[in-house]
Amino acid sequence: MAKARKPKNEEAPGAKTSENTGAKVLHQKLFLSIDFKKRQIYGYTELEVSVPDIGIVGLHAENLGIESVLVDGEPTVFEYYPHHQNSETESNWNSVSDPASAADAAAMEYVGVLKREDTANLLINCCKPSKDLSEQLDSVTLENGSQSSGEAKQNVKLIRINYWVEKIESGIHFDGNIVHTDNQMRRARCWFPCIDDEYHRCSFDLEFTVPHNFVAVSVGKLLYQVMCKEDTTQKTYVYELAIPIAPRWVSLVAGPLEILPDQTNFLISNLCLPHDLSRLRNTMEFFHEAYSYYEDYLSANFPFGFYKQVFLPPEMVVTSSTSGASLSIFSSHILYDERVIDQTIDTRIKLASALAKQWFGVYITPESPNDDWLLDGLAGFLTDMFIKQFLGNNEARYRRYKANCAVCKADDSGAMCLSSSPSCRDLFGTHSIGMHGKIRSWKSGAVLQMLEKQMGSDSFRKILQKIISRAKDPSNSIRSLSTKEFRQFANKIGNLERPFLKEFFQRWVASYGCPVLRIGLSYNKRKNNVEMAALRECTAALDARLSVIGATSDSESRDVDAGWPGIMSIRVYELDGMSDHPKLPMAGDRWQLLELPCHSKLAAKRYQKPKKGGKPDGAEDNVDAIAPLENKTSIESPLAWIKADPEMEYIAEIHLHQPLQMWVNQLEKDGDVVAQAQAIASLEALKQHSFSIVNALKNVLTDSKVFWRIRIAAAFALAKTASEESDWAGLQHLIKFYKSRRFDAEIGLPKPNDFRDFPEYFVLEAIPHAIAIVRGAEGKSPREAVEFILQLLKYNDNSGNSYSDVFWLAVLVQSVGDLEFCQQSLTFLAPLLKRIDRLLQFDRLMPSYNGILTISCIRTLAQTALKLSDSISFDHICKLIEPFRNSDTILQIRIEGSRALLDIEYQSKGISSALLLFMKYLVEESSLRGQVKLCVHTMRLCQIAVGCDSDDCVDTVTLLDLLHLFKSHVVFNNELLRYYLFCIFQILAGRPPTLFGVPKEKPLQLVDVEACIEPKNVFLVPGAEAGEPSLSALGDAKGQSLDVAPYGVPIIPQEMFMPIVPELMLPEPVAAYDETQHLEPRMESQNQPSHENPIVHEIPSDVEGPTEELAHREANPPTKEPQKEPDVVSVSVSHEVKKSVIRIKVRPSGATSRAEGSARTIERSQGIVVRHDIDRGQTSSASVDAPQRISTDAVSISNQNHVEEVNSCHDVGSRMTASIGSVKFASEGDIFGKELQCTAESGKPSTSQKADNNNRTVPPSFLPLDHSMENEAQQKYASLQTLSIGKEKEKKKDKEKKEKKRKREDPVYLEKKRLKKEKKRKEKEMAKLVSSTTDPAKKKIESVAEVKEEEPSDGAMLIKVEPKTEPSTAEARPLPKFRIKLKSKAFNNS
C-alpha cells in the first residue's frame, strides 16, 4: 500500500512557489456580461480566500480595468500594476551587433518576462481599511512573510472585484459575433482576476449574460438559463463546477452556435457554426464509442459529468485543439463530410486524444512541474489504446515504432529529460511547446508502454483504475499524481521490484539518451549456434548525461555508464520454428558476446560428382552445388532471420547486420508490421540493390494482404532503388503496378476513379509521389516519370465516384513540385503548368475541402520557380501568388501564399530580407494561428540559412527590429508566437531552439533594472532565494534542432495530404555549437541592479555564508604556518552560476590525517557548519608543482598502488587543466615519484576587489571559539570517527571483493590483467638497471605550494598544504598523497 500523502498545503518538490503570501482561493464566482455590439466585457468576481496573517492577498490580473474591490462588503485599498505596460519600455540594446548578442538580449528579455508573470500584480488589503496599504507593507515582519496559510489559523474573507476587460486581445477574443477563450498559459488573468497558477485549484460558479439568441457554453454543469428581468433581449447561462481546477482550464465560447446532442449518449454535446453542422454530424458518428471505451477501460464514469465539444473556424483558434474542464475547443478544419477519406483517421485520433486529456491532465493533475511528463504520457497511452481498439493493432504498432524512431534521433540533449529540475521547473511550461514538446510526449508514452510490458497489461490497467477511483473518493479525494506515487503503484500493484523501478526511473525519466545497439552475427555450423556480438552506445554523450543526473565521482560515472535496466530479447527464426533468447544485457560491458543455440539441424550433404554415364548436357548434375549466391545462407545455416527486441520493450536504435537473404525473408514472411518496416529500411539503406531486393519490395507492394502503410513504404523504397544501372527496374514496377490497378488495358488510359477500397486508395495515392522522387545519375527525374505524372493529371476522371478526389489531385500536383526537370523533360513543363493553372481557376470557382487543391498548387508553383530560377522569373510568380494573401481568403490559403513568398524572398535576397518580410506579414496577419504558422516557417528558413556554408548573415538593423517585435504587445498576446520568436534568435546564434540551457540569473538582473514601475515584492519569504540550475545542466544542450526539415531544402512541404505517419526528418547540427555560449554572461558593462528598487526580488548577498566559514578557518588554521589572508575576499552577486573549485589535500602521514579528521568531528558535534571544501567562487590563478621524489627506502605495495582521484571540469569563467605524470621507478625497493601540476587561469575576475575588501564584515560564529573546549572534544569524539572510518573501509572492501569476483569470470579482463602484469614485470627490471647507475641519496623531496593572491571573484581555489621535510637515509617516511578534486558548487543554492 502506498504511503500516506503529505498535506496539500506543503509545497511539493519542484513546484513553483506561489507569489501570493500563502493566500488560497477556496471558491470563485464569475459574473460576466458580454456586449456584442459595443464589444465590451464587464462584470465582477467573488473569491472566498483564506487570508494569511500578513493580511495581503496577491492575485494575477492583466488587461483589466479594476473599478473597485470590496472585502466582506467593505471597500478596501488595492494596488494594481499591469505587467504589459512596461513591456513596451525601451531597452539598452546598444551592445547588439551580431546574432549571438541578439540571442542573449532576447533570452534576458524572455526569462525576465516569464519571471515577472509569476509575480502577483493585484495586491488587496484584507485588514482594516483604516491603515494605508503601503504602511502595512512596511510593517510586515520577517515571520509573517514566511508563514503559510496551512500553518496559520484560517481567516476566510469574501473579496469582490468589479472590473471590465480593457483589451480583448489576449486570453479572450472577439471574432465577428463569437467570443471565445484560448486557454494559453498564464492568460486566464487576462479576462478575470485569479491566482493564475496551474498548481492552485478551486471550484467555480459561472454566470454569463449574452443576447437571447446566442449560446454561451462553459465548463461544468449547466444548471439553468434564464431571461434577464432588466433586459428581455439578454439571457443568462449559469454553470457550476464543483471539482477544483486551475483557472487556466476555465473556457468560454459564446455566439450563434448550433447544438448537436449525441444520439447515443445524452451527456455528450457538440456545437459549431450553422454552416458546419452537416460535417459535424458525419464526423461525430463514432465518438460515443471512444467515450464509452474510456469509461470501460478505467471502470469509472466521465469525471465532469457532461462533455462539450465546440468547433470554431481555424482563424479563431490558436491551436487545432484546446482543452478546458469538460470542454474542448477544436478547429473546424478537422471536420469532414461523407465524401472525404484522408481526414478521417487524423480527426478521430485528435478527438480521442483530447478526451484522454480530460482524464489525465485536467481531472488528474501533476503534483509539480517534474510530474508533467507522467500525465502527458498517461493521456498518450490512453489514446494508443483507442487506436489499437478501433483502428487496429497494426496501426497502433506502426505509429509507436515511428514515434520511437523519432525519439531516438532527438533524445540527445537535456531538453529531452522528462523529469529534472533544469528541464521542467525552470522552463516555465515551454517544454510542452513545439517539436520538443511533441518528442517529449512521444517519449512519455513510450516509457509507460515499456512499464506496461514489464508488469503486464492487466496490472497497468489496475494502476490507472486505482488513480481514478482514488480521485473520486469523496472522503479522501486526491486528484494530483506524482512520479513517486506512480512508482509505488508499480511496486505494489504491478509487482515490480523496487531496485528495478529505481534504476528504471533514474535512467529513463530522470536522465536522457537512448541505447544504440550495433549487432553482428555469425552461424557456427560445428556448434549449431549463432555467435552474436553486440556493441552498446548511447544517443547522448556520457558527460552530458552525468551533468543531468548530477554524478561527480568516478564510481558514479561508472554507474551512469552501466547502461539500462533489463535484458533485451533476441528472437531467432529457424527453418523449423521460432525461439526467444532473452540474453542481451542492457547493462554492464558495452561489448557483449552471445551464443544462441539453434534447434534446427541441416542434413549433411556431400558434393556428388557427375556419373560417368550421365547425359552429355549435364541434366543430372547436382543442382545444390551450383545454387545462386542469394540462397547460400539458407543452404549453409538453418537461420531464416533474426529480430532484436521484437516486442519493442526498449526505446532503442538497433543496427542489426544480417545477410541480405535474411532481410528478404523477414520482409516476406514476418507478419509483424514493425519487422517489415525494419526490413524495408535496411534494404533501402544498402548501397547496391540486387534483383532480389527489388523483387521482394515489388511483392510486398502488390500483396493486398500486407498492411497498407508497409506497402507505401515499399513503394518509396522501390523509388530509391531505381537507377540507370538497374535499367530503372524500381520505376518500371511502380508504373506497372499503378497501371494494373487504375488503367484500362484496352485503351491504355486511366479509368474513372473508384475509391471504395480504402487501403488500396491510400497505396495508389502514394505511387505518383514515389515516382516523382526517382532520380538519375545527375539528380534529374527520368523522362518516363515526368510523362507519366502529366498523363495522370490530364486524364483524371472523378465522375461516378462517391468520394472526393481533392486529396488525390493535391498529391498529383505536389508530385509535379517534386520533379527535377532535365533538358529532355523540359518540354513537359508547359503542359504541366497549364494543368495547374486550370486547377487553380477551378478551385477558385468551386472551393475544395479546406482549400487543399489551391494550397498544393501554390506550393508546387513556388517549388518549380525555385528549381528553375534561370527560366522562370520570380517577379511573375510573386504577382501570381500575392492575391492569395488577401484577408478575405481562408486562413490555410493565406498562410501558404505567405510561406511561398517568404521562400522566394530568402532564395533571391537572403535571410535578412526574408526576416523583414516576415515581420511585415506578421503585423498584417490578424489571426493568432496564422502568426504562429508564419513564425514556425521563418524558423525553418533560419535553420536552413545557419546550416549553409554561405556568408549570408543577419544585419544589425534586422536584429534590432526583431527585438522590438519580440518586446511588443502583439507578441505578449500570443504565447506560442513569443516562444517561436525566441527560438529564431537562438537558431541565428547557432544554439538549440529551446529555453533549456539559457542562464536564469543574469537575465533576471537586467530585467530588474528595466522594470522600474512594478510593485515591491511583498510576498518574498525573506532569506530565501530562487533556485539556480547547475552549471552542468545549463551546458549540456546541443545544437540539434527538431523543428525543421533537412538543410538545403528550399521548401519544406507539410505531410498534410497523406495520413501516413511521417518519418521525422531531422537536420544536421546547425553549427559547431559552443556550449559555453549559453553560460558566458554577456553585456558585462551592465550595472548591477539596485536592491532598493521596489519591484525586484531582493537577492541576499552570497558573501555571508562563505565569510562565516572563513572566520572559522582563520581562527583554526589547518596548517602550522599562519594564514595571511583568505583566498576568497568576496563573492560577486552578478555571477551566480556555479563555479569549479580545486581542492588539493596533502596528507603526509596517517596520524596527521586522523588528528585533522578529529578536529572536523568536533566541529560537527558542536553544530558548527564548517565546509572545508567550500566553494569560493571563481578560481584564482595558482600552480602547485610536486617534483619527482626518489628515496632509497622501501615503500609498501599499498602506497605504490594508491589510486589518485582526479575529476576534471571545464568552467565557463576560467580555464583549468590538470595533469599527472607517469610513475617512474628509481630503485629496487619499488620507490616511485610522481609529477603533479595543476593550473587554473581565471577567466573573469571580479572588478570590485577593493570595495569588497573594505565593506566585508565577518559575522560572529555560532559558538565562541575556545581552544580548550576543542581539545576536550577532540579526545571525546576521536574514537567515534575511527569507528565510522572502519565501517567505510569494510563497505569498500566488500564492494571490491564483488567487483573482483565479477572480473575473474570475464575473459577479456583476465587477458588485460595478464598483459598488465607482464608490462609491470618489464618495468621493474628496467628500474633495477636504472637504480644501479643512480645515487638516490643526493635527491631531495620538494613540496611547494604557491598561492598567488588574485582579485576576489565568484570562484576561489583553496589550497591546503602540510609542511614537508627532507628525508634522510636513516629515516623512512611514507610518501605524501596528493588528492585533487574538481567540484562544481554554488553558494546559497536554495
Swiss-Prot record:
One GO MF term: zinc ion binding
Name of the protein in question: Transcription initiation factor TFIID subunit 2
Polar residues composition bias: residue spans: 1244-1258, 1271-1284
Function: TAFs are components of the transcription factor IID (TFIID) complex that is essential for mediating regulation of RNA polymerase transcription.
Originating gene: TAF2
Annotated spans, Disordered: 1-20, 1104-1132, 1240-1377
Family: Belongs to the TAF2 family.
GO biological process entries: transcription by RNA polymerase II
Domain of life: Eukaryota
S-S pairs: none
Biased composition (Basic and acidic residues): 1109-1127, 1286-1297, 1336-1347
Keywords associated with the record: Activator, Coiled coil, Nucleus, Transcription, Transcription regulation
